Amino acid sequence: MTKSIQAIRGMSDTLPEEIPYWSFLENACRSVVSAYHYREIRFPVVEQTALFKRTIGEATDIVEKEMYTFTDRNGDSLTLRPEGTAGCVRAGIQNGLFYNQIQRLWYLGPMFRHERPQKGRYRQFYQLGVETYGMAGAPIEAELIFMCLRLWKALGLESCIHLELNTLGTLDSRNAYRQALVTYLQSREKELDEDSRRRLHTNPLRILDSKNPDLQPLLAEAPKLIDYLDETSRRHFDQLRSLLDQAEVPFIVNPTLVRGLDYYTHTVFEWVTDQLGAQGTVCAGGRYDNLVELLGGKSTPAAGFAAGLERLVLLLRGVQECLDKIDIYVVIAGEAVIQEGLLMTEQLRNVLPEWVIEADLSGSSLKSQFKRADKSGAKWALVIGEEEIKTNTVTLKHLRETVPQKSLTRDTLIPYLKSEG
């Protein structure tokens, strides 16, 4: 027997019963971002490897260990995008979107990272990305956070996701803090785990994000970034917190919060849940004013966020009822009337265009069809058999309430269904 081919590890299929949750989520994303007049942008899933090395940082885990990189037939090094911001900035520069313009953009699509797969973390994963360009200051950051909260409310998830904030300050203040942190950690290097020792010489801020419980006492005594902020950075962060307080958006200031990408400055934030174990971050973002210039564009203030759709779907499944709604399941009694049943079902769709109607064209027994009708979650079963064809009637059975079934003429069926909703 030929061995079957399996999906690549960490790249899963999305099956039909899961799609309604994805559709609900994607539609909510589009609705919320459009309400703020953000415009969609699309860019390739494959970019030059140099793009990510320059923006994400050579010493990050993403570039060192997680990127899907290959050499094409021309000898060029290409990479499947591990995140969307770098590609969005590249597209903006190449197409002149940032030249003396304010841009509010969004995108939705797959990203790729070679990580160890587990619940909520995959090698192909989908993100909603929201990016703003040309606006400095805290107000646009507050708008991004308001947008996130509005999305959680639209999804019914606001009670299980909370906001954490921090500031990385300007590059100058962050560099001063980085030196103080390195000096402190070097004095206690023997207490660091292997991964943190490596990061000490490459990306020391990431040590603050360690989940190793043995390191937490050491990190609690580490220098605090807030003590190294310049006055500009302090005012920026104070203004953001004031705006959130005025809008009654609850938040926690988390001084150990850093992002895994080198290009962040000033504000960083994460929306976190305690319902997904170790993969608790469902959305993350902040400000990255130096990124456009880093890629060869004109100095442009920028801020944005990315939300992980797989993790949001996991949360949705816990709070939303089945989203695969069927209004009518048409039971066709006997192979002799399948054609009549099919044509009548199509007529129903013409007059009830908003209703979801499924016709059983299997020709199987009534018992089997009613089992499928009940399992489908449909509200009504509409029975069409030889007797109904002869008398120009249908039999209507309510599948969710214990009420007598009804025999209706075709003329009275539509008004009755509309009245019952």
UniProtKB/Swiss-Prot annotation:
Task: Kindly state one GO CC term assigned in the UniProt record.
Answer: cytoplasm
Give the main EC class. ligase
Does the record's keyword annotation contain Aminoacyl-tRNA synthetase?
A: yes
Give start-end of the signal peptide: none
Matching Gene3D superfamilies, A to Z? Anticodon-binding domain, Bira Bifunctional Protein, Domain 2
Give the E.C. number(s): 6.1.1.21
Instruction: Please cite one Gene Ontology biological process associated with this protein.
Output: histidyl-tRNA aminoacylation
**Molecular function terms from GO:** ATP binding; histidine-tRNA ligase activity
Keywords, A to Z, come to: Aminoacyl-tRNA synthetase, ATP-binding, Cytoplasm, Ligase, Nucleotide-binding, Protein biosynthesis
Catalytic reactions on record? tRNA(His) + L-histidine + ATP = L-histidyl-tRNA(His) + AMP + diphosphate + H(+)
Its annotated compartments are: Cytoplasm
Organism domain of life: Bacteria
Member of which family? Belongs to the class-II aminoacyl-tRNA synthetase family.
Quaternary organization:
Homodimer.
Name assigned to this protein: Histidine--tRNA ligase
What organism is recorded for this protein? Coxiella burnetii (strain RSA 493 / Nine Mile phase I)
